[in-house]
């Protein structure tokens, strides 16, 4: 079913309610990282320039639901957004009974989590949101996996419900990487535990030619292949599961690794052949030979899906593997999609953001989409798309 797009609708003079993900870090009353606000700017500007009465809603932090808490107020976001837009953005605290907004004006509603019933997708609250608008725009992919009143319920009852440009672009990029990808497809799945990425691995094996595993996940696959992993993070109870996955899809394993005797920023890094790992070693990165082999695989790929680093890149001496892969992806002609908090941090650290085809804004939503799960906020837009 086709989802309506905001860009296809006439917004002039309409009350347009946009759910954005403006959940940004705030320090001393100021926004300390505005990536999410900047990501939402094109949507907000498009609605404003079309002459809509623009109303924005988002959550911020994890306040107790139904209780106003100044520490989780959207006030710093309204101020920062006003600076970026070059016009005042009014913060409206009490809006559920209706608000007056001028054509071309942008207002921001106070934190949706201050409303009782938001997280439980309360129907009465959803209907109150819906009554505020002529058109509801869902543009927050990062919250699309949660059925809440501001992401799901409101879309059921609004006169018209559609996807904003940010959400539409996200779904298009994910579809391109997963539905009918150009082959060969190589995925990088990093992270500390196989258990948290099991559904991802099971879903990816159906579309991938190879899956490069990294971090603690790789240690479990190394142990499953009979290699020593010393005192590395490893899920020994999932060794049979790892063997099972490796029997169904090609999982290239490290031939050399970077080890240390402790997990610390000051730890000394030593490169070893995989067969030389001792009982006292912790594997904290892939070695240079492995990084080169993985880079070669990425060079030949037509589609690359990246979720998770292959080493403890936060410590520079264990970041070379992730850096080498980031650079290989940047130099590749493949369609590349990166997603997940740690991955985005690595993309930023190694300065390759402009060389990746698409960087997903969603953490949990990105993973659930890759796993093939239905995202409630997307499903309701499909239902309303007819």
UniProtKB/Swiss-Prot annotation:
Keyword terms, alphabetized: ATP-binding, Cytoplasm, Glycolysis, Kinase, Nucleotide-binding, Transferase
Organism listed in the record: Marinobacter nauticus (strain ATCC 700491 / DSM 11845 / VT8) (Marinobacter aquaeolei)
Quaternary structure and interacting proteins, as annotated: Monomer.
Subcellular location as annotated: Cytoplasm
GO cellular component terms listed in the entry, alphabetical order: cytosol
One GO biological process term: gluconeogenesis
Catalysis performed (reactions): (2R)-3-phosphoglycerate + ATP = (2R)-3-phospho-glyceroyl phosphate + ADP
A Pfam short name: PGK
Family the entry assigns: Belongs to the phosphoglycerate kinase family.
Gene: pgk
Binding site for substrate: 21-23, 36, 59-62, 113, 146
Transmembrane stretches, start-end: none
SUPFAM superfamilies, A to Z: Phosphoglycerate kinase
UniProt pathway: Carbohydrate degradation; glycolysis; pyruvate from D-glyceraldehyde 3-phosphate: step 2/5
GO molecular function: ADP binding; ATP binding; phosphoglycerate kinase activity
Chief location bin: cytoplasm
Residues that, per the record, bind ATP: 197, 314, 340-343
Name by which UniProt lists this protein: Phosphoglycerate kinase
PANTHER family: PHOSPHOGLYCERATE KINASE, PHOSPHOGLYCERATE KINASE 1, CHLOROPLASTIC-RELATED
Record-linked InterPro entries: Phosphoglycerate_kinase (IPR001576), Phosphoglycerate_kinase_CS (IPR015911), Phosphoglycerate_kinase_N (IPR015824), Phosphoglycerate_kinase_sf (IPR036043)
Enzyme Commission code(s) on record: 2.7.2.3
């Amino acid at each position: 079913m086709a989802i309506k797009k905001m860009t296809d609708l006439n917004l002039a003079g309409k009350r347009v309610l946009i759910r954005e993900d403006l959940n940004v870090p705030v320090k001393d009353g100021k926004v300390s990282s505005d990536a999410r606000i900047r990501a939402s700017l094109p949507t907000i500007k498009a609605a404003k320039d079309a002459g809509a009465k623009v109303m924005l809603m988002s959550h911020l932090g994890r306040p107790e639901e139904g209780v106003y808490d100044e520490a989780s107020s959207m006030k710093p976001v309204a101020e920062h957004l006003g600076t970026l837009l070059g016009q005042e953005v009014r913060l409206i605290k009490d809006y559920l009974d209706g608000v007056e907004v001028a054509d071309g004006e942008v207002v921001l509603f106070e934190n949706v989590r201050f409303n009782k019933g938001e997280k439980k997708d309360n129907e009465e609250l959803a209907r109150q949101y819906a009554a505020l608008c002529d058109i509801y725009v869902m543009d927050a992919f990062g919250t699309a996996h949660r059925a809440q009143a501001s992401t799901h319920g409101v879309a059921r009852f609004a006169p018209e419900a559609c996807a904003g440009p940010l959400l539409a672009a996200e779904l298009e990029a994910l579809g391109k990487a997963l539905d009918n990808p150009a082959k060969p497809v190589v995925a990088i799945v990093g992270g500390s535990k196989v258990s948290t990425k099991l559904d991802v691995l099971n879903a990816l094996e159906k579309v991938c030619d190879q899956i490069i595993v990294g971090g603690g996940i790789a240690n479990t696959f190394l142990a499953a292949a009979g290699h020593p992993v010393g005192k590395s993070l490893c899920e020994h109870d999932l060794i049979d599961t790892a063997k099972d996955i490796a029997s169904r899809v090609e999982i290239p394993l490290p031939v050399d690794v970077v080890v240390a005797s402790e997990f610390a920023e000051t730890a000394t890094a030593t490169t070893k052949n995989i067969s030389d790992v001792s009982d006292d070693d912790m594997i904290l990165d892939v070695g240079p030979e492995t990084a080169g082999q993985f880079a070669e695989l990425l060079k030949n790929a037509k589609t690359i899906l990246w979720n998770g680093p292959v080493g403890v890149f936060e410590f520079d001496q264990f970041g070379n593997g992730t850096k080498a892969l980031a650079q290989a992806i940047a130099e590749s002609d493949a369609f590349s999609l990166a997603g997940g908090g740690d991955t985005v941090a690595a993309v930023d650290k190694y300065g390759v953001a402009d060389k990746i085809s698409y960087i997903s804004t969603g953490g949990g939503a990105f993973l659930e989409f890759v796993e093939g799960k239905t995202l409630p906020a997307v499903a309701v837009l499909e239902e309303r798309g007819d």
